[in-house]
Amino acid sequence: MLFRSPGDKQHTLASIVKVVSACDAASCDLVAKVYELVVTAGVHKASSIKVAEAAKIIENTQRDLNIALMNELSIIFDKMNINTYEVLEAAGTKWNFLRFQPGLVGGHCIGVDPYYLTHKANKLGYDAQVILAGRAINDGMAGYVAKKILQYIIQNNGNVKDAKVLVMGATFKENVSDIRNSKVADVVKELKSYSLNVHITDPHAESEALKHEYGFELTPVLSNDYDAVIITVPHSDYKKLDDAYFASITKPHALIADLKGMYRGAISSRNYWSL
C-alpha cells in the first residue's frame, strides 16, 4: 500500500512504515522485500488484503471523525462567543488530548475513504451512524462558512448584490496544486448562490484546471474594496501577509474570515472571525 499525503515533505516514502499484503504468503514476502529496499521505516505484513485495505480506510476515517468533532465544537463555541483555538490551546496542555483543528475537509482520501466503509457496512445490513454523522458535519462546513459571511454582509452592508468577497485558497490543502474534491469550490458555489460577487486567488492552483473542474477561474487583479476576505487554505505564501495588507484590499467595515486561524491576534484594523 503506497500512500502519502501530497505536499508532505516530512513523511516521505522511506520514512513511512508500509503495510503490505498479497494473495499468498510467497507473494507477500516478495512485495515486502521490494519495499524493504527503499523503505527505512520498515514493512508491516498484514494477514490479508482485506486487513491492509481496512487499515488504510480507518486511518482516514478516524481523522475525518476527529476533524468533524472539532468542526461541531467550533459551531457550538461560536454560538457561545468562545474562541475555539483558545479552547484547543488550553485542552492541549493535557497529555491525552488529540490535537486536531476545525476546517474544510476535502481531497481524494479523508473525505472519500469513509464512504467505502459505510457502503460495505450498509450492504451487510449495518448503518454506520457515527461515521456518516461525521461526514455530514464536514460536508456541511462550506455552507456554514458561506452563511456566516452572508449574515455579516447583511448586517454591515445590506446590499448583497453589490458586495464583493475574496476567497484566498482553492486547493484541497495547503502548499499543493491539487484541486481534487476541494471544498473551497463548495464555499464559492454557496457564496454565489447568495448573489455575492466572488473573487478567487491561489498561488498554487491553475486557473484553467479550476475552470474545467468547477467552472470558475482565478482573479488576475484584486480589488481594494472587498466586504469580506475568506482565507480558506493556509498556504505558506499567505503567512507573510499582515494587517496592513488586508486593510489595503478591503473596506473599513470588512470581515477577515480566517478559517484555520493563521492571523489570530494579527488583525486589528478589520473585523476578524475564525472557526
Over which residues does each language-model region extend?
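Structural/interface elements that position substrates and couple domains in central-metabolism enzymes
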Residues: 1-275
